Amino acid sequence: MAQLSLQHIQKIYDNQVHVVKDFNLEIVDKEFIVFVGPSGCGKSTTLRMIAGLEEISGGDLLIDGKRMNDVPAKARNIAMVFQNYALYPHMTVYDNMAFGLKMQKIAREVIDERVNWAAQILGLREYLKRKPGALSGGQRQRVALGRAIVREAGVFLMDEPLSNLDAKLRVQMRAEISKLHQKLNTTMIYVTHDQTEAMTMATRIVIMKDGIVQQVGAPKTVYNQPANMFVAGFIGSPAMNFIRGTIDGDKFVTETLKLTIPEEKLAVLKTQESLHKPIVMGIRPEDIHPDAQEENNISAKISVAELTGAEFMLYTTVGGHELVVRAGALNDYHAGENITIHFDMTKCHFFDAETEIAIC
């Protein structure tokens, strides 16, 4: 079990490329933290600095109150799982899982106990005598997890461990890793570019862009209360719809749209002196409904109708704006069809058009 403190962490390479900028985070014992962001945002570099595989250029890394900046990787009581399984093809599953313990000269009976315990948790008991070549991708990834588990480390680090798996296996392994966290009851830090993995697995999500932390929070918090337009657009699939306009009286207006703003949101906008200034309204696809209400109804034309099974994703044109609408599958929708859509303005978000920071 472990608590981590990352204080003003920096990573600057010799060519002066600033990869991680003033990273601050307190991780409590038994949390499942997910670093998420686009490629090149610094998430894997941060993970590698925690592991001791990258030198920290500035700031302090503390594990259980002890400064770890200069402590070798092998002495940090950390286990790591990589995107590449890195299994020894000539060894059995048992020997792959036991290899690190053998190198530490741990007693054979202890090794046997740990390997069998991990194999039981991961459903690998019947595969212990097989070699990696005889296993599926999901089974090989479980072996890699098992190799980390047997170390009984205080912190588990995972760097995009599911990215080599197909879509069905990724869903299955997401659930297995979440169950594993519950069984081990330990601190886990997980890196991914997939916001669905972040939303479904994390206790808290750390969203990064260009080496800078954009927001830290529980999945529901970052989804419902994004700190800025980047977070709002990155978290959620399909992404949040954005419309640029201004506030005129109690209306959000563009050249072709006029939508009534709820009183509580309007009060915040007035407090922030956002009236008559360029502003961005954001609204998620599920908060635009393909049915008419008393107000905030707009005519839309469907350009693409995607049936995913339980629902439709409707790609529409609304007054010159391209908007995605999430609709139930009870009705049929077709490209070229004109529909009336309703904006649930109680669910909309407003952002400063210049800074892109959330207003309300």
UniProtKB/Swiss-Prot annotation:
SMART domains: AAA (SM00382). Keywords: ATP-binding, Nucleotide-binding, Transport. PROSITE patterns: ABC_TRANSPORTER_1, ABC_TRANSPORTER_2. Transmembrane segments: none annotated. One of its GO terms (molecular function) is ATP hydrolysis activity. One of its GO terms (cellular component) is ATP-binding cassette (ABC) transporter complex, substrate-binding subunit-containing. GO terms for biological process: carbohydrate transport. It holds the Pfam family TOBE. SUPFAM superfamilies: MOP-like (SSF50331), P-loop containing nucleoside triphosphate hydrolases (SSF52540). This is Uncharacterized ABC transporter ATP-binding protein YcjV. It comes from Escherichia coli (strain UTI89 / UPEC). The lineage of its organism: Bacteria, Pseudomonadati, Pseudomonadota, Gammaproteobacteria, Enterobacterales.
